[in-house]
């Protein structure tokens, strides 16, 4: 290649120069960097903010010739050191800098990784894309890579180049759509974005890195180059135990938590991840929770979205600290015997212009047609699960959380909206699949791939589906035609139970089926029984405020609700604040009302929750056969007039507990309950206990069998059944 000073008008060099100076150069290495020349090598650099540039050669620093007033410099000769170093001076400011030329370095991404990425099978795309601190030919710097197949030009911009898209244009890997650039000598923690020019419209977009692992604190949204901090994990024992964990038969009691509103400093500041660990872990242990589930902590711009509109699928939100601080939080949870589950949102993403939306000027991560790609309820875009690179992106996001942060499970949000093309859409607002149906075939394939990957790559890790329809086999293996989730939230149980509990007790006998219907389908899936954040927002009222009656009855009903939940078949999840008996809905901008614990009724709710949790954890009959019909049997589900139900929960060794629940405010003395043998019984739990601020009606001492058959059982006992309360009984000799 000839130097610009000797090129003829209209030459390719003139064209490349024009494209560079107007930020339209598709292939920067065709113009910048090292090229063959008659006298050895031609080095060409673009430094628009420098007055003079020298090239380090075997003969020392040699001045480069200015060939364009906008900052193009050339040097031609022999003895070039590789990779070559530049010394640059801005004579106006007196600033002198030394750094290597990015265009002296080859691209590093392998063709194999690009192939897998384009095939939708690269499970660790976060190693390929994004910003990475690497060494290239002995020089330390940052390698940037981004997928933008419809771009004419992509540049890395930041404070380090005055956000000038002409300075660091990236190089593209053939037809893969992946752009790459190694910038040597770039400091750790530098803020950056990608400037993208669409090749059709010429639109210029400024986008944050979809694969970044750290972003600026909101409201800013630039990505940060990685800071080398290798975390020293100390949870080897936990991970080893998890691999062999028999979760089907184990207790699983989840505390659902929003990091920013559990507790705050007196001045309203968030707890950091370290501070959260200091306060939360002892609380979880004391209260008897086995796991904590965090509402989404991937980076998101809006507090009020609760994290469900993510813009950083590989980044812990900077609101509460660094990635290393979150690793420490998870590590400390594991060392304390607490598992950590994350809410993860592959169903949709926000319209924010700095993020995924129309990333390269086209519908890249979403569908072009809003009938497929836009969610009217949430004002968000829907991922295009049929696009392989989007599949690699989402699978890699899940892999990253489980690998980098040792997460124990993912709760997948809004699964129903993924499965149905006509979800929350009217006629004419959706497009059928290739068979004319309403099933989203690509989303089904993605979910199966996700679950297969999680269970295969991370033994013992769990996946939970928040799926609100009757879609079959959600928690059955993908190889058997299911979606492959470990468990599914039982939204039917939740809706029926809360509907029943909100009826005035005098009318509950007309809605008795809302208590009993669940047993018709309770074992068709591996169910979790949720009393989640979604039920205490948007005018639905707090759990306490949902309950009918006067003040005492509200608390009694709430105690009864929690007793029913903890004794029903299925794993458990409760949202933070439920255990306090909060009087108003969850407010994301405030901490929980901890001051309520100064009052007896609220202390009673917390004490009941604590005792129920520990009873559940330590009683095999209450958890071993949650997913199996042999773990439950009715004693009496027909006492409609008195709104009482009774049932047994069974363990694998044949032991059992007897549960009797009274959903009316009537104290029932002399209430007869059928029993399966002739043992005496004793009360092991009573939600009406004085310790829970109840009326303290109950059953002291042994309860002897009467010898009278009852409710299809060979014998029976007579008990006192407290008002709006539940009792749990065990055989006195068991």
Curated annotation (Swiss-Prot):
Q: What does this protein do?
A: Catalyzes the formation of the alpha-1,6-glucosidic linkages in glycogen by scission of a 1,4-alpha-linked oligosaccharide from growing alpha-1,4-glucan chains and the subsequent attachment of the oligosaccharide to the alpha-1,6 position.
Name the catalytic site residues: 413 (nucleophile), 466 (proton donor)
UniProt key word Glycosyltransferase: yes
Protein's pathway:
Glycan biosynthesis; glycogen biosynthesis
EC assignment: the record states 2.4.1.18
Q: Which GO terms describe its biological process?
A: glycogen biosynthetic process
A GO cellular component term found in this entry reads: cytosol
Domain of life, per UniProt, equals Bacteria
State what protein this is by name: 1,4-alpha-glucan branching enzyme GlgB
| The family this protein is said to belong to | Belongs to the glycosyl hydrolase 13 family. GlgB subfamily.
What is the enzyme's class at the highest EC level?
transferase
